[in-house]
Structure formats: structure tokens, C-alpha cells
């Protein structure tokens, strides 16, 4: 599946040093994707990690205590928005955060989450259905560093100053095409079609 392949390739690209436990937080999770624990079992196999600790967070996810698989994969589900300041369900700080098809640009509710992540040095991998949506997601990150209501030009300028580990780029591991009735002519929607990765700066006011 493109979700496993994309996550594995992106985590390898980050060059995270090997460790006993790799901790991944998946934000904006959907029950049929991130909420399907098989995804994380397959990711652990793909990365060949000793232990994979996963926290799946999203308003569409139901609270569920950790479940263990094969003695090396633990997955916890937490309903609600992701807040780096609320660590009640964390077993450890994440090595990486993943946001599949998050659509930062389309939902004001993402703003507090983005503001929090931008105050940490945690790398966050983001995927989108199209290049245009990815660029809008980057703009939303820029907007999260400014006062609400900032102009698009100001948001783009702020986004240009962000620490992008890689900017929006086509993903070789993109998945199936999606038919979207409202899509503009010529727009090709595919699962995980585009990815980028950012990290914030702890000196923004909160430790990473």
C-alpha cells in the first residue's frame, strides 16, 4: 500500500538513527487508514525496527488503549486534535510525526496543532493528493506563524522562512487515483501523490 511505502521511504529519507524504540505519531488519523493497525505492523516490517510505538490521533478516531502486536508493535488511538503540550497519552516524544492527506489549508482547526509543532524540532511528514494542495498546506504552515487573517502574500513569505527538510515533491510511491467530482479540469488526484517534510524551531517558545 502507498501509505506504508510512503511512510517507510520518508522515515528512511530523514536518516533517523537506529534505536531500540521508534516512536511515530500519526495526526488527523482516519479509522480506515491510520486507525487500521495492520498499517503499522507492515511499517515495522518494512523498517525492520526492534519496536515501533505508534500514537494515532484525530477527531474521527475513537479512544483506545494501547494494543500490542507480535511483541514489537504498540498502537494507541486518541480522539481529538493533536496538541504537543498535552502529553497524557504519550509514552515517549515522537521521533517523527506523519500527516497523511491532512489538508492543513482547508481546516482552521489545524492552526493550534501547527503552532505547537512549529515550536518543536520534531520532523513532520505531510502528504497531499495534488501539488497545489501541498503548496497550500505549506502556506497554512506560514500562516500559523502569523496573526490570524494575514494575507496570502504574507503567509507565503513566512512559509519561505520555514525549515523544510524537503519541499513539496512528487512521490514515487503514490497510490491509486481518486475520482473527485469537484476537482478542477486536469487535476490528477492520487493517494500520497505529493509529500513534504518540515520541522519547527524550539526557540519559538516551547521545548522540542
Residue ranges and their predicted role:
Residues 110-115:
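Non-core capping and flanking segments associated with repeat-based/extracellular domains
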Residues 118-208:
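C-terminal functional extensions of proteins
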Amino acid at each position: 500500500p502507498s501509505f506504508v511505502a510512503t511512510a517507510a521511504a520518508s522515515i528512511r529519507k530523514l536518516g533517523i538513527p537506529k534505536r531500540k524504540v521508534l516512536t511515530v505519531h500519526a495526526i488527523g488519523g482516519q479509522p480506515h487508514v491510520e486507525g487500521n493497525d495492520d498499517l503499522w505492523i507492515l511499517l515495522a516490517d518494512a523498517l525492520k525496527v526492534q519496536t515501533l510505538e505508534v500514537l494515532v490521533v484525530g477527531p474521527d478516531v475513537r479512544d483506545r488503549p494501547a494494543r500490542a502486536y507480535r511483541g514489537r508493535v504498540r498502537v494507541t488511538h486518541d480522539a481529538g486534535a493533536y496538541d504537543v503540550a498535552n502529553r497524557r497519552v504519550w509514552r515517549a516524544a515522537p521521533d517523527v510525526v506523519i500527516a497523511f492527506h491532512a489538508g492543513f489549508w482547508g481546516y482552521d482547526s489545524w492552526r493550534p496543532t501547527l503552532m505547537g509543532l512549529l515550536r518543536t524540532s520534531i520532523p513532520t511528514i505531510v502528504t497531499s493528493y495534488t501539488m497545489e494542495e501541498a503548496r497550500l498546506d505549506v502556506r497554512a504552515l506560514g500562516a500559523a506563524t502569523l496573526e490570524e487573517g494575514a494575507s496570502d502574500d504574507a503567509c507565503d513569505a513566512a512559509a519561505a522562512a520555514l525549515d523544510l527538510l524537503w519541499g513539496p515533491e512528487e512521490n514515487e510511491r503514490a497510490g491509486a487515483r481518486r475520482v473527485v467530482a469537484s476537482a478542477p479540469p486536469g487535476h490528477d488526484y492520487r493517494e500520497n501523490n505529493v509529500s513534504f517534510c518540515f520541522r519547527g524551531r524550539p526557540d519559538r517558545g516551547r521545548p522540542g
